[in-house]
């Protein structure tokens, strides 16, 4: 039977919060009325060992995954930082490459101008070499020159005002009798007497002296006292003796304008220029072969039976002991 008064007290206690729920369930009055059904056996429900092992392995896998994720996150942080640095560096490199390309576009006309200036410089050097040996005046062809000589003959001294034709007066003073002239004045007079007469042939192909021609060739050769310097001296002397120094110089510049270097030009001219064909190389007497320029010592060979310049034999060195060696290019 239900106890209505007890249930009313319990309900009021539950509604008002005076009676805890656990206390109500712990003192259940209906426990004596109903027989509680107990499970078979004294042990409660338990999981099988297989299920327990599976649950345990699953927990381990989840934990391992968490550890791996954390490790990967820690590794990816510096990688991301390095990638960002690489991207910034690449952007800087790209900017610099674009700047270099822009500068190259600006330098291209300068390079073309450099080639033009090189060609102009080559032409000017040839023109100046010819101009040094041209005739400035071929005699008393102007009134100032005649007046200068007349004043000099009458008074014995040059006129007080600046004279245009001082070299002509120097020549007159050097040739006058009873006067003492310095060496520099004598040299100036000798140069005036050796000036070529101006003509079409001498203008285009001046007959340079062997020394001047060799010095002109030396400006195109690298180094000092090389076999090509000796070859330039030998060819200059032979060309001067044959009266073809101007033609030889023109042929030399022509080969240079084709893109060849000075060594190749001299070698080619020694084999093709008509003034050198079949010419025997000169003999140079030395104390011993140690006095031969050091760059030439490695090019000394035994003298062949019939050496000629067009076959590459530059000169023959003869020592005081009677030994001979030929310089070969």
UniProtKB/Swiss-Prot annotation:
InterPro entries: Filo_VP35, VP35_IID, VP35_IID_b-sht, VP35_IID_hlx
Domain named VP35 IID: residues: 204-329
Disulfide pattern: none
This protein's UniProt keywords: Coiled coil, Host cytoplasm, Transcription, Viral RNA replication, Virion
Transmembrane residue ranges: none
Top-rank taxon, per record: Viruses
A Pfam family per the record: Filo_VP35
Coiled coil region boundaries: 70-120
Summary of subunit composition and partner proteins: Homooligomer. Homomultimerization via the coiled coil domain is a prerequisite for binding to L. Found in a trimeric complex in which VP35 bridges L and the nucleoprotein. Interacts with NP. Disrupts innate immune signaling in infected host cell.
The protein's role, per its UniProt record: Plays an essential role in viral RNA synthesis and also a role in suppressing innate immune signaling.
Protein name: Polymerase cofactor VP35
Organism: Lake Victoria marburgvirus (strain Angola/2005) (MARV)
């Amino acid at each position: 039977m239900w106890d209505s008064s007890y249930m009313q007290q319990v309900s009021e206690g539950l509604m008002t919060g005076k009676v805890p729920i656990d206390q109500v369930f712990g003192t259940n009055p209906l426990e004596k009325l109903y027989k509680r059904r107990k499970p078979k056996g004294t042990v409660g429900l338990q999981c099988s060992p297989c299920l327990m092992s599976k649950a345990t392995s699953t927990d381990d896998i989840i934990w391992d995954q968490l550890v791996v994720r954390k490790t990967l996150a820690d590794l990816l942080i510096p990688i991301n930082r390095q990638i960002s640095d690489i991207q910034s560096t690449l952007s800087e490199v790209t900017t610099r490459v674009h700047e270099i390309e822009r500068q190259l576009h600006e330098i291209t006309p300068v390079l073309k101008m450099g080639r033009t200036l090189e060609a102009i410089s080559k032409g000017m050097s040839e023109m100046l070499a010819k101009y040094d040996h041209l005739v400035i005046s071929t005699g008393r062809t102007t009134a100032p020159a005649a007046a200068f000589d007349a004043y000099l003959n009458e008074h014995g001294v040059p006129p007080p005002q600046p004279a245009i034709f001082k070299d002509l007066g120097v020549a007159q003073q050097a040739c006058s009798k009873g006067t003492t002239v310095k060496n520099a004045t004598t040299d100036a007079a000798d140069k005036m007497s050796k000036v070529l007469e101006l003509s079409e042939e001498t203008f285009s192909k001046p007959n340079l002296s062997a020394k001047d021609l060799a010095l002109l060739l030396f400006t195109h050769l690298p180094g000092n006292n090389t076999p090509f310097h000796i070859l330039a001296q030998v060819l200059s002397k032979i060309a001067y003796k044959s009266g073809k120094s101007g033609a030889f110089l023109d042929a030399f510049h022509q080969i240079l304008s084709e893109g060849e270097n000075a060594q190749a030009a001299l070698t080619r001219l020694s084999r093709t220029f008509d003034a050198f064909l079949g010419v025997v190389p000169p003999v140079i007497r030395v104390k011993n072969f140690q006095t031969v320029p050091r760059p030439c010592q490695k090019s000394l060979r035994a003298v062949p039976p019939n050496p000629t310049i067009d076959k590459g034999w530059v000169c023959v060195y003869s020592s005081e002991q009677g030994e001979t060696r030929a310089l070969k290019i």
